[in-house]
Amino acid sequence: MSASVKVSAMNAKTLFALCLVLAPLGCASALPAQTLSEDEILGQAEARIQKYRTGNADLRLLGADGKPLRNGAHVRIEQTQHSFLFGANIFMLNHCKTPAENAAYEKEFSDLLNYATLPFYWWGYETQPGHPNYADTERLAAWCAAHHIVMKGHPLAWNEGQPAWLPADLSDAMRLQMQRITDIVGRFKGEIGIWDVVNEATDFDRDSTRKGGPTLTAGIRQMGVQDYLRTAFARACRANPQSTLVINDYVTSDDYMQKVITQLADETGRPLFDVIGIQCHQHRKDWSPEETWQICERFAKAGEPLHFTEATILSGHQGWELRTGNPQFDWASTGEGEQRQEKDVTQFYTVLFSHPAVQAITWWDLADQGAWQGAPAGLLRADMTPKPAYEALLKLVKGRWWTRTEARVARQGRAQFHGFYGGYKVTAEDHGREIVGTFTFDAKSPQPVEVRLN
């Protein structure tokens, strides 16, 4: 098929699907695919990071009186936040075994991360009909807001389980499922702005879902997966049109693209999602840089941002089967495993941070204590002490990928610097008094960025 197909001869949905097929030919809404070797992926990562994650900022600095700072004034410019979202689920906040461990969990989370995934699993969130656990969410949200941490809710719709009280009638069950989306997104409008709307729809009808969520699974089957997806996302959008809506899946093959992503559009063909979520639990084997890059390239063809929503690299023995038939198996972190985890985590984050389509990485789980599957998945050990992988990430996220610099003010209060995209604090002296201003800066920021210091 030629890339010169006339747009006027097709509807918008066909065009969206065509963009996925023709992405390597340069479809305007998609990134061109790049096939790179491991040496190229890693060797060129720093250059890509500089290209996609940093820029030149032109500031216009004003004092409290609205007048430009004096020519020659010295200013300190310090980053306070990343635009890129470095996150983890926050399920263990206030649920660790001891107060000291709770305090350590809070500190290590807020020291490293700016993004948190909050739990909304229906079967545990609403154990009695009409009584969702909003109070616990409000406590989590208050802590995140106090620490300037962006929040995401996960998941609004997932048929891996279901409330014990869910009606057996399929139409009633699906009506309640959709109403839940409306209620939750509307309730937390202004607090939680990102949502995993539908989880794992590609292979929704599998053994575990038929066992754990039989009514919901049958309801999706009866409704049709496309209508299920469209209705869920339309509900979320109506409840908060400003929210960022994520489709999330563990499937990383073309099936996800063909069965879900290309189908998730309204009647005009406009995509109903804002972000493609990619799970990346590496319990059995760590992904190579080539695998990670290829997955980025595969889904970047859709022309929408990518979030790596559930990232796991173990610091112990690898394999899903280790606890099969032996739930008491001590799946512990090991010294050798921690060294391997440090290396692979560093490579994994470097590759993702260097890819222009990726906007977020969420680690699953921050600590071994309470980790999914009981695996040594954390960046912290069970006692909340940091593993080498945590320390390595901290050196990247708040070190190599973080900006602290100084500048001299030129005429009309202008000052320039080169830095990573995000939030900043600028400090200057005015007649012996320290004055401070804040600003944000990214690739789309209008220049100059005007900053008032007080």
Kindly label every feature range from the protein language model.
Residues 16-26:
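Bacterial N-terminal signal peptides
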Residues 31-93, 152, 224-227, 231, ...:
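Beta-strand-rich domain onsets/edges
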Residues 86-90, 113-118, 149-155, 193-197, ...:
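Hydrophobic faces of well-ordered beta-strands that scaffold small-molecule active sites
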Residues 92-94, 122, 157-160, 199-203, ...:
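Active-site-proximal loop/turn and secondary-structure-junction residues that shape catalytic pockets
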Residues 98-111, 416-423:
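Short Pro-Gly-centered beta-turn/loop motif in secreted/extracellular proteins
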Residues 115-129, 137-245:
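Substrate-binding cleft and catalytic face of glycoside hydrolase catalytic domains
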Residues 128-131, 135-150, 219-249, 254-329, ...:
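Glycoside hydrolase catalytic-domain groove-lining segments
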Residues 169, 173-176, 187, 196-223, ...:
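Aromatic-rich peripheral "rim/lid" segments of glycoside hydrolase catalytic domains that contact
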